[in-house]
Amino acid sequence: MTQNNAIGIDYSDQRLRVLVEEYITQQRGTFSLQGACAYVLYWAMEDGHTLPAAGALYQSDKLSPADCQRVSAVLQKIVREGRIAADGERFQKIAD
């Protein structure tokens, strides 16, 4: 059994940003990078935007490290915009 079988996605940077924004909107308190990555992966699987993998079966519930880094970059950009605060891999919305 392969343990390191993460799933890649083929979303554009713009669509990825939209999904991360949706995830942030749904959060009431603090949230994590892992939560944002799981949200993006869920919608990629629902929308058919996962990259083809050997075996073609979903044998993982984890987003690929490269795509999770893309999610992290989006979150960091939103931090720089002043809309969320970061504490390591935890984030919190800043009140309007």
Feature-to-residue mapping (PLM):
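Short amphipathic alpha-helical interaction segments
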Residues: 63-80
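Alpha-helix N-cap and coil->helix boundary residues
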Residues: 31-35, 70, 86
